[in-house]
Amino acid sequence: MSNTTSSIITIGREYGSSGRQIGQEVAKYFGIKCYDKELLEHAANDSGICKELFEHHDEKPTNSFLYSLVMDTYSFGYSSAGFNDMPMNHKIFLAQFDAIKKLAGEGPCVMVGRCADYALSDWPDCFSIFVHADLDVRIRRIASKYGKSDREAKDLINKTDKSRASYYNYYTNKKWGSAKDYNLCIDSGKLGLDNAAKVIIDAVQIFDASKKK
């Protein structure tokens, strides 16, 4: 099969599952860009909100303020009074939402996290993936990568996953990591990073071929 793709590939991931690294390998194979924290920079540039605020609120859970009001205000754009009065975490989410759609409109790419699968749920070219791994595998990876004890690594994993799940569940009204909400779920602990990337590449190529029928 060709090593090109016409798809936008979104990757949700458990912390320590190496979803970002796998996404980078997939992007490298197809010769397309991989956006992870780069999404924050694009959103900051487009919205005029400083990048540090995006980093502070990145995939952090929110509270108060009804989701429906956020999305109602979204339809009026950044210049509306409603947007100006909105809490900063909601401004951040909507700016990222727009940046994701804008980058997807520029062509095939890989997007990691930040509810990209939800932002592009109505795009026929979007292929959504969730990468997970057993907790003990992730503990070893994080402990080795950051020089932490197993207990410290476990605490960081639990904290980060809880934050990502709360953020995703709040803004999408779906359940983070639920298999039925993704086109493909893959265990990077069982397969290893290289094989996980290969499985994703094969799946995307099959998806691309199905669109031509």
Regions found by a protein language model. Give the residues of each.
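RNA pseudouridine synthases
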Residues: 103, 115-122, 141
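Short beta-strand-centered segment that lines the nucleotide-binding/catalytic pocket of NTP-utilizing
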Residues: 33-44
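Small-molecule kinase domains that catalyze NTP-dependent phosphoryl transfer to phosphate-bearing small molecules
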Residues: 59-70, 74, 149-193
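NTP-dependent small-molecule kinase module
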Residues: 97-101, 170-213
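Conserved phosphate-donor/acceptor-positioning beta-strand/loop module used by diverse small-molecule
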Residues: 122-145, 150-158
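Pre-Walker A (Motif I) flank of P-loop NTPase domains
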Residues: 4-13, 107
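Glycine-rich phosphate-binding P-loop
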Residues: 11-24
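ATP-dependent small-molecule kinase phosphotransfer cores
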Residues: 44-108
